[in-house]
Amino acid sequence: MKIMIFICGEGLGHTSRCLALGKELLNAGHEIKFGAYGYSKELVEKTGYTAQEIPSEIKLVGKAGSLDLTGSIEATLKSAQLLGGPKLLKLLREFKPDVVVSDSYYLGTLAAMVLKLPVYLIINQSNMEEFFKNRGVPVRIIGKLTKKFYKEVFEKTDKIIIPDYPLPYTVCRKNLNFAPKLRGKLFYSGPLVREKYEDIDSIPLEKPHVVSLIGGFGYREPIFRKVLTTAMLDPGINYTLISGPSLDPSKLGGVPKNVRILNFVEDTYPYIKSSDAVIAPGGHSTIMEALSFGVPILSFPDEGHSEQESNAAVVEEEGYGRMLSYSTPPEVILECIREVIEDEAYRNKVERLQRLSGELDGPKTIRKLLEKEIGKKAS
């Protein structure tokens, strides 16, 4: 099969799971082409693949730990490319894919529909209108239009893939709200993780060890400072902080001896596997990675980001970790760290999800789905 994979470039989690799927499809002998932009395109190319530049779709901005929704809308409109649609149509006509897999990239989804190509949409949120609640009147109007738009798209896609555990273990379940007539299109693949647990070697981290995966947006810097202060309260707990491309670790001031700060790390899996707890925002893909490696989570969702807050709430409710906020003081953060490290109930639950992730094998499951539903038509 020839498969076009479109990737939303806001948030590297979309890219990570598409790379997991692309690797599986390539290993099975299929021809694929990635379409991406921004950090997403850079990560695809750093991994060793080529990526076709596609128009940007959404641009997120924020400050002091909070997502600036109005600013994000303005930034998105300013960066919008008027000829984006024709460019995508040209790309699809030249590549002639048998199927388009779109990870939350709706411009590419629409282009595929125009050309009457099969479309498999990967999403971990369907209730995007929640993003716009309790905002100013113009933003609320955008929310209503958004709901109508997504409803039309969902009805026209061939399949909606949820890259999460099936119910009752679905972490993104609070972000899903589909009409009953769409339930037949839903496919819970299991987590799309780039590496299998058994294929990753552990690294020697001084125990107990907490790994922070907060990165990507400069407005998350307050968490770094909170974690550094937390580390000073108990030198017996060790930390590795992976900063991400938008943060400058040199501006963080004094670093305790029990803390190691690393710049952007391409392969975080050895760190996750070797840790006793992971500090992360509420992003879906990062949570999937931690759970697939059997590690409890301390989640700091971006304030005002309803999708992340909902994911973190499920982590808290199900006992996979704790939900914290940017206002949580270091003393409380430390107690939460001690709790998830010392209480075996957390470890037992996440180890169950680690086993389940391996059994589901999300990338392989989607490959088989495409081969069954598209492969026969393509051959």
Swiss-Prot record:
SUPFAM superfamilies: UDP-Glycosyltransferase/glycogen phosphorylase (SSF53756). CDD domains: GT28_MurG. GO terms for molecular function: glycosyltransferase activity; hexosyltransferase activity. Keywords: Glycosyltransferase, Transferase. Its EC number is 2.4.-.-. InterPro entries: Glyco_trans_28_C. Pfam families: Glyco_tran_28_C, Glyco_trans_1_3. Belongs to the glycosyltransferase 28 family. PANTHER family: GLYCOSYLTRANSFERASE, UDP-N-ACETYLGLUCOSAMINE--N-ACETYLMURAMYL-(PENTAPEPTIDE) PYROPHOSPHORYL-UNDECAPRENOL N-ACETYLGLUCOSAMINE TRANSFERASE 1. This is Uncharacterized glycosyltransferase MA_0452.
